[in-house]
Curated annotation (Swiss-Prot):
Transmembrane segments: none
Family: Belongs to the CsrA/RsmA family.
Alphabetized PANTHER family for the sequence: CARBON STORAGE REGULATOR
Name of this chain's protein: Translational regulator CsrA
Species for this entry: Clostridium beijerinckii (strain ATCC 51743 / NCIMB 8052)
InterPro entries, A to Z: CsrA, CsrA_sf
One cellular component (GO) term of this entry: cytosol
Amino acid sequence: MLIITRKKGESLMIGDDIEITISKIDDGSVKIGINAPKNISILRKELYEEVMEENKQAIKIDMNLLKNIKKR
């Protein structure tokens, strides 16, 4: 993990087209702005993990349902 120190108003670049800017620093909280291409998905980690879990649940197959389809 790379750890970088930034002050309010300062930015860092990821590759050529993703810019992260520190916009506000409060007690125990940092507000950041992210400028990235529209094709890049940006999610908070807790939301990303929730989406991944829902995707895993969505691909589970009910074997009894498949057996019933096969019998027809």
